[in-house]
């Protein structure tokens, strides 16, 4: 079970358009704990409108106090066709965001959480297996209204698809909403867009297995990424470097089909 807490600050929750408050969020977490759930996740956001460093850290402290086995800590992104897109709020600048991440990350590490993905932290043994499969470019089924899926076929074709979003259409039997084949020219970008979010090393054989491409297809991009200190390379693995984490968008852009 995953709970979209987002913040324990009632003013921030209202600004985000959420219908719950901090007390209700904590009550839901405690209900999950007393019901016997061994594993659950809390979603938190940072970089919220007018959010200070201390407010962001206070959200984390309150989350840590609830002792979730897994915690997802995302930076707010402004999506198209949303209230924030039409009326952009004042957000923390890059320096403030870095302070929030650096100090928040340290709080989580000191509390016994291990970061295994850009926005995911877990107690030992509680990494989300679905997340790991997803970020490793594995396949997954779309079960239910609005669900997304990915399938790789024996001939190497890769299909992404989604189910009907509205329950009324789904109940009428209109299950499939959209499907798209992942073209060969896009597979390297999609693979690394997923794998480089994980902090673990990327086996080179997995690149070939999941994309159907040879390593030579990305040799120039890999060589440039190494020169820029975005990644390090061994005979068997590629590993994102600290510098690459800071410039992830620039690293991924190398693999875009032009």
Which residues make up each language-model segment?
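Minor-groove-contacting beta-hairpin "wing" of winged helix-turn-helix DNA-binding domains
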Residues: 237-241
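Solvent-exposed, charged/polar functional surfaces in cytosolic regulatory/catalytic domains
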Residues: 107, 224, 254
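C-terminal scaffold of the Radical SAM
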Residues: 1-213
């Amino acid at each position: 079970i995953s709970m979209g807490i987002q913040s324990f600050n009632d003013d921030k929750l209202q600004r985000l358009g959420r219908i719950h408050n901090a007390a209700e969020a904590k009550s839901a977490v405690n209900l999950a704990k007393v019901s016997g759930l061994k594993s659950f996740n809390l979603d938190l956001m940072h970089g919220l409108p007018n959010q200070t460093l201390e407010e962001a850290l206070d959200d984390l402290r309150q989350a840590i106090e609830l002792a979730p086995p897994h915690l997802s800590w995302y930076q707010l992104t402004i999506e198209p066709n949303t209230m924030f897109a039409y009326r952009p709020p004042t957000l923390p600048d890059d320096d403030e965001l870095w302070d929030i991440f650096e100090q928040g990350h340290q709080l989580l590490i000191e509390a016994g959480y291990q970061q295994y993905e850009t926005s995911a932290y877990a107690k030992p043994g509680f990494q989300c297996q679905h997340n790991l499969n997803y970020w490793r470019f594995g396949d997954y089924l779309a079960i239910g209204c609005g669900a997304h899926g990915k399938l790789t076929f024996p001939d190497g074709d890769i299909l992404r698809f989604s189910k009907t979003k509205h329950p009324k259409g789904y109940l009428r039997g209109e299950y499939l909403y959209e499907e798209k084949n992942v073209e060969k020219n896009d597979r390297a970008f999609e693979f690394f867009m997923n794998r480089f979010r994980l902090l673990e090393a990327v086996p080179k054989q997995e690149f070939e297995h999941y994309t159907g491409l040879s390593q030579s297809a990305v040799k120039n991009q890999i060589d440039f990424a190494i020169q820029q200190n975005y990644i390090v390379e061994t005979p068997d693995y590629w590993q994102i470097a600290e510098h690459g984490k800071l410039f992830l968008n620039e690293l991924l852009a190398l693999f875009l089909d032009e």
